[in-house]
C-alpha cells in the first residue's frame, strides 16, 4: 500500500510539474534554484535579513523553482540584494518523494540539516533577522527543525511562511513549540495535503501569488 501511495504521488507530481515550472515567474527564477549566501558569507559582512528555505519534493537545487525563489526575490527588492542572504536547505535534504511518508513528514537528516543552518545563522550573524519558509515537504522540514531549536535561536527567527503545509492538520496549523504569531500558513482550500493526506491535487501548485505578495508582506511586517 505504501508503494502504491508513493507511486501515485510520483505520477501526480510528474504530471503537474510542467504547470508549476512554466508559470509567470519561472523564467526569472530558473537561475536561482541554488543559493548559499549563509554558507559562504563572512561574519564581518552580515546582512539585515537571512532567509532560509526548504523546497518541495523533486524540486531542483536547494531552493527549488517556485515559492522559495519568489519570496527571495521579493525580500531582495524590499531590502536590497546586499542586505539579504538567501540559503536553501540542501545536502542531506534530498527532497525525495518517499520521505513524505516518514512520521515527521521528512527525514531526520533533513531536519538536522535545517537546524544546522539556523544555528549557523545565529553563530555567524547573531544580530541579523532570520526568516524562513518551506513548500510542501519543505514545510515539514521547517516545522521539525524549528520546533527543536534553542530559545535564543527561536527568538532570532522573526517569521516563517509555509506553503502547502503537509503537517497542517497534525500540528493544528502551527509549528510546535514556536510562537504562532511568527508563523503564516498558506493552504489553498482545495489542497488536500493541508487536511492530513498526501494526495497531490492541482491546488497544491497554486501558491505563486501568495509567495509573491502576501508572504513577503508578512515577513516584512515581522522584520520591520
Swiss-Prot record:
Kindly list the residues the record flags as site (Transition state stabilizer).
Answer: 57, 137
Got any disulfides in this one, which pairs?
Answer: 46-125, 187-194
Protein name per its UniProtKB record? Cutinase 1
Origin: domain of life: Eukaryota
Give the active-site positions: 136, 191, 204
Lineage of the source organism? Eukaryota, Fungi, Dikarya, Ascomycota, Pezizomycotina
Its predominant location is secreted
Offer one example of a GO biological process linked to this entry: carbohydrate catabolic process
Q: Where is the signal peptide?
A: 1-16
Gene induction: By contact with cutin.
Q: Write down the SUPFAM superfamilies for this protein, in alphabetical order.
A: alpha/beta-Hydrolases
Reported regulation of activity = Inhibited by diisopropyl fluorophosphate (DFP).
Q: Which UniProt keywords apply?
A: Disulfide bond, Hydrolase, Secreted, Serine esterase, Signal, Virulence
CC per GO annotation: extracellular region
Reaction(s) catalysed by this chain, per the record, are: cutin + H2O = cutin monomers
